[in-house]
C-alpha cells in the first residue's frame, strides 16, 4: 500500500486553506473598489461607548468599546447629541480621524472629541496638516485600522475605511438606488452579479445604463423600494449593502431637525477636498447621491468599515470551495480538489 508523502500532506493543507476566512461581522457580497482590489462590508455602522476597554494597533489598551451595529439599518439617531467622555451610551457619528490614536497629532482625536469653536476643524488636522489622509503613516487615525472591533474579529487592523477614490469606483461600477427598510431610509448598493430574490423587485437609480452617473434624481426614480425586515434579509443574503440615513452631528454636538433622510459617511481622504478644513465621503438624500461630498471634519458622520479580500483565495459570493481530499486511483495517491485531480507533486492530471 502506498503511503501519502509529506509533500502531498502539505499540498492537501494548502488547497484546503484556499478559502479565505472573512472576519466575524462580514456581509457575504464582494465589491470591487479598484481594478484589482475587492472588499467585503461590515454588517452595520460603527458604534462606540466609553465603557470597557479594547486593544489597539500600537500595542496599547484604550478606554471604551467599539462594535458594529447588529443590523445594516440600525442607527443611534438623536442620542448622538449626548456625546461626551462621561456619556456611557453608544454613539455612531464621529469627527474625522477620531480613532483614539494619540499619535495622530490632532487636538481632537478621541471618538467623543468636540471642538465647538469657529475654527473647530483645525483641531482635527492629522499630522498637523490639513492635507494628510488617514492612510500611510497616519493609518492609525482610521477607526478600523487602529481599534479592535469587539463583535467583528476583536483584533486591530482587520478593518478599514474606504478612500474617496474607492467610493467613486463603487458608485460607477456597481448598481445602486435609494430605499427604505421598515421605514428607515437609506442608500442601497448591489454587486453587478446581483439577482433579485423571488418576489422582490428593485427599482435602480443607477445600473451602468447611461453615460453619466445621476448625482441628482427624483424620488419617483426609486418609488416602490420599500421593504420589510424579512424582505431585506433576502436582499442582504443576495448581496445588498444598505447605508442608513443616520443624519449628521454639527460641531456644537447638535443634530439639525428635519434631516432624517440625510446620510453621510466618511472616507479616509482629504487631499482633494476644496477646503483644508473639510474631508470627503459618501453623501445622499431623497434626491441626490454622491461618492465625494465634503463636510467639515469636525462634523459627526457615519462610518461603515470594510475588510480587504485576497482575490486569490477569497470565497465567491455564492459558492464555497470544497475541501481537498486524498484519493487512491490505480494504486496511486492523488489530491481531489474542486473536482480536479492533482498528483503528489501538485501537477494537475
Q: Where would I find each of the regions flagged by the language model?
A:
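Hydrophobic h-region of N-terminal signal peptides that target proteins for export
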Residues: 10-18
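Conserved positions within compact, well-structured domain cores
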Residues: 21-311
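Short, small/polar residue-rich loop motifs at catalytic or cofactor-binding pockets
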Residues: 335-337
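Short, glycine-anchored, charge-dense loop/turn motifs used at functional sites
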Residues: 342-347
Amino acid at each position: 500500500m502506498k503511503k501519502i508523502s509529506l509533500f502531498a500532506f502539505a499540498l492537501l493543507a494548502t488547497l484546503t486553506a484556499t478559502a479565505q476566512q472573512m472576519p466575524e461581522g462580514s456581509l457575504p457580497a464582494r465589491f470591487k473598489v479598484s481594478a484589482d482590489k475587492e472588499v467585503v462590508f461590515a454588517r452595520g455602522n460603527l458604534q462606540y461607548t466609553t465603557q470597557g476597554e479594547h486593544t489597539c494597533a500600537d500595542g496599547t489598551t484604550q478606554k471604551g468599546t467599539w462594535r458594529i451595529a447588529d443590523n445594516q439599518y440600525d442607527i443611534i439617531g438623536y442620542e448622538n447629541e449626548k456625546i461626551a467622555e462621561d456619556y456611557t451610551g453608544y454613539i455612531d457619528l464621529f469627527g474625522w480621524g477620531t480613532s483614539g490614536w494619540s499619535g495622530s497629532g490632532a487636538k481632537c482625536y478621541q471618538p467623543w472629541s468636540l471642538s465647538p469653536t469657529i475654527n473647530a476643524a483645525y483641531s482635527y488636522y492629522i499630522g498637523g496638516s490639513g492635507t494628510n489622509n488617514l492612510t500611510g503613516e497616519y493609518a492609525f487615525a482610521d477607526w478600523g485600522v487602529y481599534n479592535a472591533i469587539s463583535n467583528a474579529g476583536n483584533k486591530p487592523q482587520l478593518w478599514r475605511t474606504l478612500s474617496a477614490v474607492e467610493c467613486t469606483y463603487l458608485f460607477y461600477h456597481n448598481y445602486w438606488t435609494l430605499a427604505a427598510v421598515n421605514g428607515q431610509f437609506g442608500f442601497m448598493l448591489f454587486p453587478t452579479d446581483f439577482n433579485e430574490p423571488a418576489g422582490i423587485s428593485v427599482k435602480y437609480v443607477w445600473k451602468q445604463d447611461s453615460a453619466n452617473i445621476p448625482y441628482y434624481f427624483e424620488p419617483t426614480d426609486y418609488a416602490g423600494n420599500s421593504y420589510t425586515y424579512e424582505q431585506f434579509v433576502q436582499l442582504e443574503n443576495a448581496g445588498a449593502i444598505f447605508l442608513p440615513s443616520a443624519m449628521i452631528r454639527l460641531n456644537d454636538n447638535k443634530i439639525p431637525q428635519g434631516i432624517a433622510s440625510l446620510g453621510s459617511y466618511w472616507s479616509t481622504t482629504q487631499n482633494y477636498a476644496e477646503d483644508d478644513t473639510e474631508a470627503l465621503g459618501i453623501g445622499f438624500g431623497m434626491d441626490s447621491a454622491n461618492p465625494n461630498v465634503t463636510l467639515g471634519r469636525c462634523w459627526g458622520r457615519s462610518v461603515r468599515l470594510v475588510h480587504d479580500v485576497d482575490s486569490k483565495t477569497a470565497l465567491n459570493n455564492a459558492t464555497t470551495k470544497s475541501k481537498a481530499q486524498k484519493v487512491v486511483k490505480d494504486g496511486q495517491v492523488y489530491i481531489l480538489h474542486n473536482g480536479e485531480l492533482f498528483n503528489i507533486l501538485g501537477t494537475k492530471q
